[in-house]
């Protein structure tokens, strides 16, 4: 087989439409554009979304604001005040909080929030701490360990 012997497969090519060549050619007179009207004239026609003067759909629908962030980090959150029921000097992780029943669902890595008071020293391992939570934990004699959140739930 040589390059000059190549041919397209049967049915792969389609003849172009020759319009305006007489009525017996099939696309004569109005060339497939119908009778009269804006769509049969030359030029661009109507713009996308135009509904003939009726208020178009894209203007009838309200403008929506404040879309949620698509890649927002999702944390399992708990307040400092809820940790007061744990044993003093214990290590607190997401798993120990689930075992203790303080957290019922795992929504992602653990984040400690600063609402409430803490009087016992705890070693807390979490992905994130608020500034107020970190101050309260360290004031109670505990420590905050920031661990990297490998499996980030999004």
Swiss-Prot record:
Keyword terms: Ribonucleoprotein, Ribosomal protein, RNA-binding, rRNA-binding
Record SUPFAM superfamilies: Ribosomal proteins L15p and L18e
One GO molecular-function entry: rRNA binding
GO terms classed as biological process: translation
Any one annotated GO CC term: cytosolic large ribosomal subunit
Pfam family, one: Ribosomal_L27A
InterPro entries reported in the protein's UniProt record: Ribosomal_uL15, Ribosomal_uL15/eL18, Ribosomal_uL15/eL18_sf, Ribosomal_uL15_bac-type, Ribosomal_uL15_CS
Domain of life (superkingdom): Bacteria
Family affiliation: Belongs to the universal ribosomal protein uL15 family.
Subunit structure: Part of the 50S ribosomal subunit.
Protein task: Binds to the 23S rRNA.
Protein name in UniProt: Large ribosomal subunit protein uL15
């Amino acid at each position: 087989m040589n390059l000059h012997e190549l041919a397209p497969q049967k049915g792969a090519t389609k003849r172009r439409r020759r319009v305006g060549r007489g009525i017996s050619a099939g696309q004569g007179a109005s060339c497939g554009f119908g009778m009269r009207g804006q769509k049969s004239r030359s030029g661009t026609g109507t713009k996308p979304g135009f509904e003939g003067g009726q208020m178009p759909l894209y203007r009838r629908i309200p403008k929506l604001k404040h879309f949620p962030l698509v890649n927002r980090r999702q944390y399992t959150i708990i307040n400092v005040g809820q940790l007061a029921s744990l044993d003093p000097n214990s290590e607190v992780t997401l798993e120990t909080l689930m075992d203790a029943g303080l957290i019922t669902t795992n929504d992602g890595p653990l984040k400690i929030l600063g609402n409430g008071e803490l009087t016992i020293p705890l070693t807390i391992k979490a992905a994130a701490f608020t500034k107020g939570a970190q101050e309260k934990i360290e004031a109670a004699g505990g420590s905050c360990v920031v661990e990297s959140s490998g499996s980030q739930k999004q």
